[in-house]
Every structure is written in C-alpha cells, then in structure tokens.
Amino acid sequence: MPLITTETGKKMHVLEDGRKLITVIPGDGIGPECVEATLKVLEAAKAPLAYEVREAGASVFRRGIASGVPQETIESIRKTRVVLKGPLETPVGYGEKSANVTLRKLFETYANVRPVREFPNVPTPYAGRGIDLVVVRENVEDLYAGIEHMQTPSVAQTLKLISWKGSEKIVRFAFELARAEGRKKVHCATKSNIMKLAEGTLKRAFEQVAQEYPDIEAVHIIVDNAAHQLVKRPEQFEVIVTTNMNGDILSDLTSGLIGGLGFAPSANIGNEVAIFEAVHGSAPKYAGKNVINPTAVLLSAVMMLRYLEEFATADLIENALLYTLEEGRVLTGDVVGYDRGAKTTEYTEAIIQNLGKTPRKTQVRGYKPFRLPQVDGAIAPIVPRSRRVVGVDVFVETNLLPEALGKALEDLAAGTPFRLKMISNRGTQVYPPTGGLTDLVDHYRCRFLYTGEGEAKDPEILDLVSRVASRFRWMHLEKLQEFDGEPGFTKAQGED
C-alpha cells in the first residue's frame, strides 16, 4: 500500500502486510541504548511496525554536514512520515545548528506535545497529588526561529517571530488534543502583559478559537504565574498551550514534578510528519554503562502507537510499564539510586515479562483518535482594510550620549518630512530625557515620525537613512505601520 492519509488527517506508510513503516534514529550518547530497549518491547508486544534505521546528530556533524541531518535520513522521513528518535547531541554556542531543531523545522512539526503524569513508586514531593497534564508547545516560531544578528560588537539581537497562522494552529491542536483525551480545561500561558504584539497574538488566537469549543473551559494565564501555580497546585492543570520558549521551560518544570526527564516523553507533530522522542538529552557520561532509564523513549513510542491508531498495542505496553513500576521490584538507578538500581536490560526484560498484566492502582487514560486541525493555508491569512507607514525606527551604533545624539539627528532630519520623536536604549527612552538613570550601551533606537501627506514613501525613508548614515553607523530599520488605524508597533518605556 502507498502512503495513506487517515480520516483524522494523519499521514503514514502502510506496507502490504499491514505493518506501518517508521524511521528509527538511535541518536547519540544514551540514545542507542534507550532505542534498543524500546524496540525490544515493541517487538515483544508484536507492534505492527517495520523500521528504516537512519542517523542524525554527532556522527553526521563529524562528517562535515552542518545541519546534522544527512539527505538519506531526510528521504526516509519523507517516505515514512513517522519517526522514533533517540536524543541527539546539540552544539553549544558558535557552530552547527541543533539537529533536533533542524528536524522539527524541516518538517514543520509545529506542535510539541509533552504529557506529564504521576508514576507509581517514583519518589517526588508531589506523590499522591494526581498530576496528569499535557504541555502543548508551539514548536517552530518564537525565538527558536534562530534569526540572530550582532547589532554592534557588544549587542546581540534575536527576532521573536509569532504569526497568526502558527498561533491558530497550535491553539486548535491543543483543543483537539483535549477532546481526544477527554480533558475538560485548556490553559493558554503567555507573556502578553509585556510583549503585547508577539505573545498577544497567541492570546488573541486562543480567545477566538476557544469559542468553537464550548465543551472545554478556556483560561488565559500569565506564564510566570503558570510556573508559580504548577509548583503550588499542579493538579489544577489539564492542558497548557504556550509559545516555544515558554513551553520549553514549563515542560521541563512539569517533568520535575513527576520524577525527572527519565519519565518525560514527547511528540513533535505536523500536518505531514510526526517525530517521537524523549525530552531528555544524550547524557554521554552514562552511555554504554547499561544503567540508564529508557522509560521516556518507551513512552514516546507509546505516543507514536496512538498516533498510528494502534491503541490496543499502546495500552498493552503502557500497562506493562505501569505494572512494573507499581510492583517496585525492578527499578532503574535514577529512581532508587545507582548503587542498587536495575540495569537497563533488566528493566526492559521486566516490562516484557509483564506484557498482558494490568496495574492495580494506576489507570491508563482512555484515548480516542486525534484529529489534526485544519487552518487557512494562505500565506497571509489576515488582510487589513487599510495600512499606512507612519514613520521609521533607525537603529544606530554610537558612543555619543543621548542628548548629543538627539541634537545631531534633529539637524540631519531638518528639511525632510520626518521629525525625531524619541531615542531609546535597550527599550527605555533616553531622549528627550525623562529623568531616569539608564546604563547605556552603544545601540540606540531612533524613532522618526512622518509629517508629510499620506504615508511615508520608500524614497523618503531611504533619503532619511542616507542622511543618518553620513554621520552614524546604522544596522537596522523598522517601518512603523498602522493597520486599520491601529499602531503595529509598541512604545518605549517612558515614551508618551
């Protein structure tokens, strides 16, 4: 059989014998051990799967492939559409891109799903609280777009990109997931009180889409309060949908509530491809010692089976895992201490021996087929009735103090249809002076407002920039636009 699309919108490769073909990437560090243990359990459970094993990560970087993902791996994923992946080493600082992020962005796996639940016999201060929640993290936008520039030799900039399309997709995904898992409440965590345009886009999308799901309670929460509430009363949460950076932080926090990253699976799901992996890293210091806990990768495989709509096999494996933990005789070193913890192979064998058994105290949640949400595919889904360029922010590098810079820019703008409105330094207005005490850096935003008829024209803007450039080094321009009469830009701290 060829690549098929299910009634719920998922794409998968089904072989003639009915098995579903997936790509397996063993990964780096402890990854191969975790994946090997998981494949043994899948095979013992007679999961109807076939595998193509491919590589990514450290070995690929060593071959000089800067993305960390070779073409043969990309071709396999395009064929199978489903990936089970071990952790990959991530370069730190300068150098290659993260292969993890490359895979997510290459295949537009826009939804990162990280379930968290209490496990039996896993020590945690929250034992008995009934924690059972899912963090749904937008996976390709935000600061993780990775668009960075050195503005001056000592000032760096990262662009935080949040789109309406990306926000609507992740919000719809969260509500559909809540329905499929029988959950009754979705929280949206943003920092829209500070980043009113970027983070505010997710908040506005959430409030609009929530009206289509009257059976689910929709609650907006500021992200720092979400972190506070997760520590104080985590059982109040069922689904949290949030932006990329916020989700990265909150999901690691939630995994700490239930015993650590060894019990934290995840899925990266898009309209075309789904990638399943543990949240934890490659932990090279434990590699090859047969002591690691493969539970996170195994639970990621359980998530994969449910995505493939192999619910019976998923329940079989999850029940065996929960029975093993509940029994408490064979537990790994991260749970009971490495001096007396079971070997990885012993733990894996215990789970296999418990296939077909049901835990007495811990129940597996009921799952229904999850429907991938559909959104407007237009590149520009929002078309304003009117728009107007009302000015320009010119970013310059200089060691001048604000008053000297302001006077110089006012002289340079004389005779143009622009007036200098204000100058800010790291977001705080420093000219005209407000009486504040600002520690300055060599990066100024200089805001010019248009005083001519209609809107500012490109030749007029370029003439202004040319005048500024005759005296100062500039590195960045931003048009100030109004959409339907509303400003598409924010004010500096202290700006009137």
Swiss-Prot record:
Q: Name one Pfam family in it.
A: Iso_dh
* Entry's EC annotation: 1.1.1.42
Subunit structure, as described in the record: Homodimer.
Question: Where is the site Critical for catalysis?
Answer: 144, 191
Keyword Ion transport set for record = no
Q: Which molecular function GO terms apply here?
A: isocitrate dehydrogenase (NAD+) activity; isocitrate dehydrogenase (NADP+) activity; magnesium ion binding; NAD binding
Q: What does this protein do?
A: Catalyzes the oxidative decarboxylation of isocitrate to 2-oxoglutarate and carbon dioxide with the concomitant reduction of NADP(+).
Q: How is the cofactor bound?
A: Binds 1 Mg(2+) or Mn(2+) ion per subunit.
Q: Which residues bind Mg(2+)?
A: 248
What family classification does the UniProt entry report for this protein? Belongs to the isocitrate and isopropylmalate dehydrogenases family.
Per the record, the domain of life is: Bacteria
Question: GO:BP terms for this protein?
Answer: glyoxylate cycle; isocitrate metabolic process; tricarboxylic acid cycle
Positions contributing to NADP(+) binding: 88, 90, 193, 229, 232, 277, 281-283, 285-286, 293
Look up the record and name the cofactor or cofactors this protein needs. Mg(2+); Mn(2+)
Species of origin reads Thermus thermophilus (strain ATCC 27634 / DSM 579 / HB8)
Query: What's the encoding gene here?
Result: icd
Q: Which reaction does it catalyse?
A: D-threo-isocitrate + NADP(+) = 2-oxoglutarate + CO2 + NADPH
Keywords from UniProt, A to Z, are: Glyoxylate bypass, Magnesium, Manganese, Metal-binding, NADP, Oxidoreductase, Tricarboxylic acid cycle
Claim: Transmembrane helix is one of the keywords in the record: no
Q: List the disulfide bonds.
A: none
Give TM regions.
Answer: none
**SUPFAM superfamilies cross-referenced by the UniProt entry:** Isocitrate/Isopropylmalate dehydrogenase-like (SSF53659)
Cite the binding residues for D-threo-isocitrate: 98, 100, 104, 114, 137
The record, for InterPro entries, names: IsoCit/isopropylmalate_DH_CS, Isocitrate_DH_TT1725_C, Isocitrate_DH_TT1725_C_sf, IsoPropMal-DH-like_dom
Protein name as catalogued: Isocitrate dehydrogenase [NADP]
